[in-house]
């Protein structure tokens, strides 16, 4: 027999309260504290909105600035992600992960309190036009540090935490930046724990097209190599300064991975580097980063390096075996997602001069990314994302 919305909601609230109570190292905030911190959730303090609620900037009683994510009461799917995020992030700390201050589970309120990060996310800054739109200067040194920082954060999740953690939604909008442009991986609502002695987990596919590894998107088989694929896409976005998909570009330039492979085969990868750097970058290092991106996005998961190896490759501690670089795996090889265009003949630099990054270009997700702290569950419900078992 089914239950009424009210009785189901009460049972759900009780279950959430029970799970939160079982977590020892999570600070529980009173709802009135949250109201005071946000000036009663004033419009001036609202910094974003996603499919599962809103995010506010707040000042806690101890003077700390916080990003306060309020889960919508109408969202039932979001409760699962709410609990997942608390369970995952409350147990771990790393300089390249967001820090959870605590939560509020008073009555029907479900609120997460994070450290506030001043410079938003990569998709709202670098991929939205860089300095021109965000006021942030992403020189080559800053980009390299961001790439290495994200890689270190993922290596920590994949290899140092027990059980290992697969993030499942690595993308530009989930990489937040502090005032020093140090990257923090955020949004653990879709994260999965990898039990010991298991090679993969079969699960409902969730994430964002453009970052999804083909074997995961098509078969639902999740391993750490799916995160590594997503990182490879992100790495190429950071170096090129463009999203993995940009429909405002000519057809032959729209898909970043295909473009990178074409240029790699012609030994012209340097043409993919962001022209916004005005030639002020280490060409050898930039091309090495792009080749690492190709390594991470190879069709066979077994050929993708581990994240600790990626860190060593990025920092130059390990040389790239160029013989191991093969064509990247593309979902479009398995599913009819797009119409292919002709092979490009012009260089990327000419293309970059004629077609700059528009603010409306797509990075694989159709939702408003003004909410850099929005729940990963939103990704699963965006118009161009997967959210079904395949």
From Swiss-Prot:
Q: Keywords in UniProt for this one? A: ATP-binding, Cell membrane, Kinase, Membrane, Nucleotide-binding, Phosphoprotein, Serine/threonine-protein kinase, Stress response, Transferase
What does the annotation give as the result of altering residue 69 to E?
Loss of kinase activity. Impaired autophosphorylation. Enhanced freezing tolerance due to impaired phosphorylation and subsequent translocation of 14-3-3 proteins in cold conditions
> PTM Phosphoserine: at which residues?
173, 202
Summarizing activity control, the record says: Activated by cold.
Subcellular location field: Cell membrane
Q: Map out region (Disordered) in residue numbers.
A: 345-390
* Membrane topology (UniProt): Peripheral membrane protein
Residues with the Phosphothreonine modification: 203, 208
Q: Where is the active site?
A: 169 (proton acceptor)
Tell me if Phosphoprotein is a UniProt keyword of this record.
Answer: yes
Where are stretches of biased composition, namely Low complexity?
Answer: 354-390
What post-translational modification does the entry describe? Autophosphorylated.
Question: Could you state one GO biological process linked to this protein?
Answer: protein autophosphorylation
Which residues belong to any copy of the Protein kinase domain?
41-320
PANTHER family associated with the record:
CYSTEINE-RICH RECEPTOR-LIKE PROTEIN KINASE 3
Name of the protein: Cold-responsive protein kinase 1
């Amino acid at each position: 027999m089914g239950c009424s919305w009210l009785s189901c909601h009460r049972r759900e609230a009780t279950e959430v309260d029970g799970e939160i109570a079982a977590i020892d190292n999570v600070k529980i905030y009173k709802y009135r504290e949250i109201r005071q911190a946000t000036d009663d959730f004033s419009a001036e303090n609202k910094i974003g909105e996603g499919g599962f609620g809103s995010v506010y900037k707040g000042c806690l009683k101890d003077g700390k600035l916080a990003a306060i994510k309020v889960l919508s009461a109408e969202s039932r799917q979001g409760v699962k992600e709410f609990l997942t995020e608390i369970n995952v992030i409350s147990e771990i700390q790393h300089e390249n992960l967001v820090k959870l201050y605590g939560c509020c589970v008073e009555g029907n309120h479900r609120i997460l309190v994070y450290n506030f990060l001043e410079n938003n996310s990569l998709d709202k800054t670098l991929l939205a036009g860089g300095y021109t739109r965000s006021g942030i200067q992403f020189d080559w040194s800053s980009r390299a540090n961001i790439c290495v920082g994200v890689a270190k954060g993922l290596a920590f999740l994949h290899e140092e935490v027990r059980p290992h953690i697969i993030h499942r939604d690595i993308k530009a909008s989930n990489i937040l930046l502090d005032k020093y442009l140090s990257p923090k991986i955020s949004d653990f609502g879709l994260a999965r724990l990898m039990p010991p002695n298991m090679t993969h987990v079969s699960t409902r596919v969730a994430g964002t097209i453009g970052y999804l590894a083909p074997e995961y998107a098509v078969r639902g088989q999740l391993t750490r190599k799916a995160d590594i694929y997503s990182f490879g896409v992100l790495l190429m976005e950071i170096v090129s300064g463009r999203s993995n998909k940009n429909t405002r570009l000519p057809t032959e330039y729209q898909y970043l991975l295909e473009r990178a492979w074409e240029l790699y085969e012609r030994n012209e990868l340097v043409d993919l580097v962001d022209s916004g750097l005005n030639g002020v970058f280490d060409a050898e290092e930039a091309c090495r980063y792009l080749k690492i991106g190709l390594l991470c996005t190879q069709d066979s998961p077994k050929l993708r390096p581990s994240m600790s190896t990626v860190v060593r490759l990025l920092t130059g501690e390990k040389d790239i075996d160029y013989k191991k670089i093969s064509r990247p795996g593309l979902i479009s090889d398995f599913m009819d997602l797009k119409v292919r265009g002709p092979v490009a003949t012009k260089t990327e630099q000419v293309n970059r001069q004629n077609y700059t990054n528009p603010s409306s270009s797509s990075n694989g997700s159709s939702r408003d990314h003004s909410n850099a702290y929005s729940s990963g569950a939103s990704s699963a419900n965006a118009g161009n994302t997967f959210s079904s078992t395949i």
